[in-house]
Amino acid sequence: MVSFNSLLVAVSAATCALAFPFEFHNGTHVFPRQSTPAGTGTNNGYFYSFWTDGGGSVTYNNGPAGEYSVTWSNADNFVAGKGWNPGSAQAISFTANYQPNGNSYLSVYGWSTNPLVEYYILEDFGTYNPAVSLTHKGTLTSDGATYDVYEGTRVNEPSIQGTATFNQYWSIRSSKRSSGTVTTANHFAAWKQLGLPLGTFNYQIVATEGYQSSGSSTVTVNPAGGVTSPIAPTGPSSVSTTPSGPSSSPSPVGTCSALYGQCGGQGWTGPTCCSSGTCKFSNNWYSQCL
């Protein structure tokens, strides 16, 4: 991801064996007993991942079926969610009570291997739009909205294969929403048309993510049916391409940053294009023309 990237550490089934994290009375959910420990595992038929770098307070609980909840306060960085491992080009239904205060994402999030790719279908976010540090590739129309497609590169960053250099693919919805159906096959097909192919699916979750922020999120995930093959036989209703360049609208060369100059980052008010090179994400606060 563009503003914070997470390595979801796989642990053995024995390590992840958990006491059920909810108390029940006459079949009714009363209170969570304790936070689910960080790690990966299965819960009520769904794969889940919970990673935190330990900063601030983050409490994650698995709920019934595809439900989970997470509350965070002054958290440094975390990613949590439920879904599938492996993922697929499926339609995913979700509902969320998503209440971020600061930098946060609500997305369909996953990885592929060969090539190693981290991807986001971003449905809602907090105060930071990651597009400012990404390269715009085109647009697609799916599920009643336009999505802008972006690409980013992470260099020597954590991944599901350890520290690595890999690409990120993003679809960012033009109108935020906290519930609906995401036809992932449309995004995967559009990305391929735009020169952004996925490889073999790894895990795929509806994730809540936070970075130096607070908030709460309760999400229910369900498969909505539809295509489950790695390559969708049908594509989105429309796809358009844009020339390679920064995520913002093109600016005259004279107003773009020079090679090795800053071109993005949270709070950056200067040029977001490069007169030479490409705007590359470095960290949450700094992107550079390289």
Curated annotation (Swiss-Prot):
GO biological process, one term: xylan catabolic process
GO CC annotations, alphabetized: extracellular region
pH dependence remark: Optimum pH is 4.5.
Domain GH11, residue spans: 34-222
Name of the protein described by the UniProt record: Endo-1,4-beta-xylanase B
Leader sequence segment: 1-19
Name of the gene: xynB
Source organism (scientific name): Phanerodontia chrysosporium
UniProt xrefs under SMART domains: fCBD (SM00236)
Described function: Endo-1,4-beta-xylanase involved in the hydrolysis of xylan, a major structural heterogeneous polysaccharide found in plant biomass representing the second most abundant polysaccharide in the biosphere, after cellulose.
